Amino acid sequence: MDKIVVQGGDNRLVGSVTIEGAKNAVLPLLAATILASEGKTVLQNVPILSDVFIMNQVVGGLNAKVDFDEEAHLVKVDATGDITEEAPYKYVSKMRASIVVLGPILARVGHAKVSMPGGCTIGSRPIDLHLKGLEAMGVKISQTAGYIEAKAERLHGAHIYMDFPSVGATQNLMMAATLADGVTVIENAAREPEIVDLAILLNEMGAKVKGAGTETITITGVEKLHGTTHNVVQDRIEAGTFMVAAAMTGGDVLIRDAVWEHNRPLIAKLLEMGVEVIEEDEGIRVRSQLENLKAVHVKTLPHPGFPTDMQAQFTALMTVAKGESTMVETVFENRFQHLEEMRRMGLHSEIIRDTARIVGGQPLQGAEVLSTDLRASAALILTGLVAQGETVVGKLVHLDRGYYGFHEKLAQLGAKIQRIEASDEDE
């Protein structure tokens, strides 16, 4: 099993880093390519991540032709043939986000059989909102032997109110509605930038989607969609991770192509902590002086609130700010597992239900730790940068799902970090 080894204590990050296309955007975009019954769809600025390879397999398994040019960061999908109805367990079980193929398959074929999803084990992440919305559009759903089977002679528009602004459910319903009869209105819809990016692609394919980025999205169904060329939006979570890395090491880093508007909640909290954040033509610059960092209170919320996908990394930043900080996690259950690993490094923290209290400014020591999920893996590596001595982070399968060349980018900024492959250790 690969490991990342960090020599901590003196890792002030300086320089510039370029951000990849967004993982959370490209996966539903790949699912959307199934909707194009005419022409090829080309996605540009595609990140090279294990989740992308899995989604390519899912789409390819539906009888679409998928060509991934890694050097060009480009995926071409030809879904003009007969799309099959079943997304098999061997692919879908590896990644939770693959459930978003359910809506597109239904829209194209009228019958879908999709394995229950896998991925990060972060609390209870039910898919009932996906299913309730599809039922409102005339879909009959049954769950048997680990599969969701959905049938509809013809999807019809519906007025759907979501109890929670689920990103995945919003994406699934948007895609299903593009080829439905009539108008679909989704209220309390997710408002993330990745939702907007999906709407842009769908409209480029000939769909009629309005209101993406607001709490009410309206989709007027059309007869068919066609291929197009689309550039994947930049990854705001990767950008945020490097903002935090610069802040917690007292660094000076330009995050190229980062979008201020997409990172506004994070930037607000960085400024509150005493971090200098500057919008420049090429991206966002982050500077900090460790002695100026102040403890803060943060609560995760659906967008435009503070993103849950930045919670773990921000708790790492809290470890170097003197005083007691608090982090309240309202989006997912069981998302403080990384703090248990940080305690092995000397972190003083307490978890009471959905709230973590973190005592910052205390010396941390390097240790051997294990990643528990995607964002936790990044948080543990960042903590290793500021801990004294050597930190070894294992279970990198999580890291590779969402960060491309993470250790290399940190090393280019001055971090003492290397990745040791399993074969290297065996020699």
UniProtKB/Swiss-Prot annotation:
Keywords assigned by UniProt, alphabetized = Cell cycle, Cell division, Cell shape, Cell wall biogenesis/degradation, Cytoplasm, Peptidoglycan synthesis, Pyruvate, Transferase
Subcellular localization: Cytoplasm
The protein's matches in InterPro entries, at most eight in alphabetical order, are given as: Enolpyruvate_Tfrase_dom, Enolpyruvate_Tfrase_sf, MurA_subfamily, RNA3'P_cycl/enolpyr_Trfase_a/b, UDP_GlcNAc_COvinyl_MurA
Under which pathway is this protein filed? Cell wall biogenesis; peptidoglycan biosynthesis
* Keyword Nucleotide-binding (UniProt): no
What is annotated as the active site? 120
The text of the family note is: Belongs to the EPSP synthase family. MurA subfamily.
**By what name is this protein known?**
UDP-N-acetylglucosamine 1-carboxyvinyltransferase 1
Query: Which gene is the coding source of this polypeptide chain?
Result: murA1
